[in-house]
Amino acid sequence: MNNLWKAWVGLWTSMGPLIRLPDGITKAGEDALRPWKSTAKHPWFEIEDNRCYIDNGKLFARGSIVGNMSRFVFDPKADYGGVGENLYVHADDVEFVPGESLKWNVRNLDVMPIFETLALRLVLQGDVIWLRCVPELRVDYTSSAYMWNMQYGMVRKSYTHVAWTIVFYSINITLLVLFIVYVTVDCNLSMMWMRFFVC
């Protein structure tokens, strides 16, 4: 399954706006509050927060940098094993106070199950700073993201994750089928439900 995903990303790389990311820190929670690549000669900025998590296929991230800056570039990328895809954020996801701070709170970004880390390329006062965030995975097996959860488990070879996804998906489908059969077989019950939804 891993080779299939790698081949798919390779094909996507040849077609889409993907870039090669620099090598850097990959351990979760380690060195998240310092850049792994920076052209800044002196550390004139301070990273106050850099966190992210995946919730059923959606990426959420927040962070902040404090320092005397008058201009910035905020360029987040999804890291798919060293290959980065540009992530597009809304203007109101980033808050910039000139001379004081840059804060971001990115929500509901779609990422593929082979997502590894969030790479942030920041240009502050002309200095290029790279941050990396390894996401925490939050799973709700009762959500509608069954395929994403199943693919994530297959890519990570977490077969327990795949099994729980299949179990909850089967329960939901069974309940749906029982409800449809129960309502359509009993005509009186069908009319009652129709009146309920019409009114």
Swiss-Prot record:
Monomer. Interacts with host TRAM1. Disulfide bonds join C52-C133. This is Unique short US2 glycoprotein. Residues 183-199 are cytoplasmic. GO terms for cellular component: host cell endoplasmic reticulum membrane; membrane. It is a single-pass type I membrane protein. The signal sequence is not cleaved. The chain crosses the membrane at residues 162-182. Belongs to the cytomegalovirus US2 family. Gene3D superfamilies: 2.60.40.1200. Participates in the inhibition of the host immune response. Early protein that redirects newly synthesized major histocompatibility complex (MHC) class I heavy chains via the SEC61 translocon to the cytosol where they undergo proteasome-dependent destruction. In consequence, infected cells are masked for immune recognition by cytotoxic T lymphocytes. Seems so far to be specific for HLA-A, HLA-B, and HFE loci products. Does not interact with HLA-DR or HLA-DM. The gene is US2. Pfam families: Cytomega_US3 (PF05963). Glycans are attached at N68. It comes from the Viruses. It comes from Human cytomegalovirus (strain Merlin). Residues 1-161 are lumenal. The keyword DNA repair does not apply. Keywords: Disulfide bond, Early protein, Glycoprotein, Host endoplasmic reticulum, Host membrane, Host-virus interaction, Immunoglobulin domain, Membrane, Signal, Transmembrane, Transmembrane helix, Viral immunoevasion.
